[in-house]
Amino acid sequence: DRGLFWQKFSDFNEDGTVKTDVGVLIKVKQISCYGNDSYGGMSGRDIMALACGLYESCDFGYMHDRVQQCEYLAQGFYKAGVKGVVLPAGGHAVYINMDEFFDGKRDHTTFAGTGFSLELIRRYGIRVSELGDFSMEYDLKTPEQQAELANVVRFAIDRSRLTQEHLDYVIAAVKALYEDRESIPNMRIVWGHKLPMRHFHAFLEPYANEEK
C-alpha cells in the first residue's frame, strides 16, 4: 500500500526512486518482535496449549524420546550414505552440511542449500530450513565472517507428532535426493538481496547447475 503514510515516511532519491521503504522497515521489525505477516495471531486456546507444551517438555521421558528421534534420523541418514550429516545429533533437529552433501562442488553464492530445500518439498513434501549461505548472508559478509559460517540445512522434528514411519520416509527421500544431487538447482536472488532478515521475504528463482 503506497498511500499517504508510505509517501510521508519513506525516503526517496532525487530522481524519485525509493531509497528506504518504510513498509519494509516495519515488516522487519514485525518479524523480529512478533512473526511474519502470514503467521496470524494466537487465540486463548492456543496460548493454553503452548503452556501445556512447555510443561510437558520438562518431563524427562519426553526429552529422552526427543533425543532418540533425532539420533534415529541422523543415524538413518548416515547409514544411507548421505554425506554431511552432523553427528552427534542434538535434541530438536538434525543438520546436514551442504558443502559436504554436494562434495564441495557448489560455490557458496549458488545458494544450493536453498535449492536442496526447494527440491525436498517439491518432490517429497518435506519442509526444512536452510540456515546457511542464503539465510546467513554469506555473499554480504567479510572474508573473516564467511569463514565462521556453517552452511547447513535443518531438519527440525515436530514435538509429539512424528512416528518412526515418518522418519523412515524422510530418510528414504533424502537418500534419493542425495543420489540425484547433480540435478538439484542452484538459486539466485531476484528481489530483496540486501533486505534485513531476507530469508523471510526475499524472492529467489532456480537455475540449472550447469548454467552460470
Locate predicted features.
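PLP-dependent enzyme catalytic core of the Aspartate aminotransferase-like
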Residues: S57-C58, R123, S135-K212
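Compositionally biased, intrinsically disordered low-complexity regions enriched in proline and serine
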Residues: F5-N13, G125, D139, A208
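Generic non-transmembrane alpha-helical segments
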Residues: Y72-A80, G115-I126, I171-D180
